[in-house]
């Protein structure tokens, strides 16, 4: 049946008896049809009236665009967070960590809440409900939610970020740097098969995940200068070890090995009981030739830390030892950033430790500036 002309829009009765409504938008000149055929003219008229009202109020956008926006605004915090994590260019271990914080602390309370309905009051109640028993995990979960909501602002799902809780910066660990002599004592207590890992971590500042993915093909050595080409990292994701990109783009870097450590690595590589042949052979492994796990290395390393009376130290502190030693050797902040694979000076500075012996040396040199020889 032909369309019946009206003052605005048109109605067409189909063979089925249902009514099809449409109109030509004065905004873009395109014809738009109702989302469905209506049972009666009254319902079709109502749809046309609502569209005309949007045009008159200068609020009109194409129906498909409105439907897409409505669907997006209905997405829940859990759905959006999962999408956010999946789309981020993050190392596998980082994605797993974010997913864990979200699964344990965000989804149980806020997961079913539409992103568009998130408010500062909801965030404050969620924050208070987590309690203060696990401050680090609580802070990390909040940081994940805040980052997710920042993207929601960019996607125009919310007008502003509802995460506005002022957090005190976590207290920095006051850790004194190890001396080379103490490092030797620590290494002496570590299982001999992968003892070289202690020296590599401490003198090159590699992350543990970077070290356990270094292969023979990643070692460039002309007999005088040795470089480790950091290109990949390994991390535990759930029950599996996943090899992927390094933590950041800057983390892909060549790291020059101090000559005395390079000599240790050459000796280690020449021992077929410690490293297999072939370009894909891992530099450090278990006695069975498998990838060295963080837990196994930690158990061995803790014995060394206990030997020097420093049970508070962790694996990652060896990276900070390396940053400190490099700074003491004269590395600039920019050079430290490159060596550690950091993107900001703040992060490079954060990894440096204080040294009592170094402080005494600085004090002596200050007296020398005054023309006084101690």
Swiss-Prot record:
Belongs to the 'phage' integrase family. The active site is at residues 207, 247, 316, 319, 342, 351. GO terms for molecular function: DNA binding; hydrolase activity; transferase activity. Pfam families: Phage_integrase. It comes from Mycobacterium phage D29. PROSITE patterns: CB, TYR_RECOMBINASE. SUPFAM superfamilies: DNA breaking-rejoining enzymes (SSF56349). The gene is 33. This is Integrase. Its EC number is 2.7.7.-, 3.1.-.-. Integrase is necessary for integration of the phage into the host genome by site-specific recombination. The keyword Hydrolase applies. Gene3D superfamilies: 1.10.150.130, Intergrase catalytic core. Residues 173-364 form the Tyr recombinase domain. One of its GO terms (biological process) is DNA recombination. Keywords: DNA integration, DNA recombination, DNA-binding, Hydrolase, Transferase, Viral genome integration, Virus entry into host cell. PANTHER family: PHAGE INTEGRASE-RELATED, PROPHAGE INTEGRASE INTD-RELATED. Signal peptide: none annotated. Residues 75-153 form the Core-binding (CB) domain.
């Amino acid at each position: 049946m032909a369309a019946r002309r009206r003052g605005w829009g048109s109605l067409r009765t189909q063979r089925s008896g249902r009514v099809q409504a449409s109109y030509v938008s004065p905004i873009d000149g395109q014809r738009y049809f109702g989302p469905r055929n209506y049972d009666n003219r009254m319902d079709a008229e109502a749809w046309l009236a609502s569209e005309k009202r949007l045009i008159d109020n200068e609020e009109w956008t194409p129906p498909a665009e409105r439907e897409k926006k409505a669907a997006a605004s209905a997405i829940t915090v859990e759905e959006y967070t999962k999408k956010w994590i999946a789309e981020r260019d993050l190392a596998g271990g980082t994605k797993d960590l974010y997913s864990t914080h979200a699964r344990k602390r965000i989804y149980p309370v806020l997961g079913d809440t539409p992103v568009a309905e998130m408010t500062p009051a909801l965030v404050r109640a969620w924050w208070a409900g987590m309690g203060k028993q696990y401050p680090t995990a609580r802070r990390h979960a909040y940081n994940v939610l805040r980052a997710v909501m920042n993207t929601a602002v960019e996607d125009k799902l919310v007008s502003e970020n509802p995460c506005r809780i002022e957090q005190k910066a976590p207290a920095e660990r006051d850790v004194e740097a190890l001396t080379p002599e103490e490092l030797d004592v620590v290494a002496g207590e570590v299982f001999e098969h992968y003892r070289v890992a202690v020296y590599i971590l401490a003198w090159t500042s590699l992350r543990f995940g970077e070290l356990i993915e270094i292969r023979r093909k990643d070692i460039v050595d002309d007999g005088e200068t040795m470089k480790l080409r950091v290109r990949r990292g390994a991390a535990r994701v759930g029950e599996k070890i996943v090899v992927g990109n390094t933590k950041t783009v800057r983390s892909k870097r060549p790291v020059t090995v101090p000559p005395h450590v390079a000599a240790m690595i050459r000796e280690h590589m020449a021992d077929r009981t410690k490293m297999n042949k072939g370009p894909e052979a891992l530099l450090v492994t278990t006695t069975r030739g498998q990838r060295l796990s963080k837990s196994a290395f930690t158990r061995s390393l803790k014995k060394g830390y206990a030997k020097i009376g420093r049970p508070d130290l962790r694996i990652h502190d060896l990276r900070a030892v390396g940053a400190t030693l490099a700074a003491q050797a004269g590395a600039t902040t920019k050079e430290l950033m490159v060596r550690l694979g950091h993107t900001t000076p703040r992060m490079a500075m954060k990894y440096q430790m204080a040294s009592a012996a170094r402080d005494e040396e600085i004090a002596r040199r200050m007296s020398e500036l005054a023309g006084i020889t101690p």
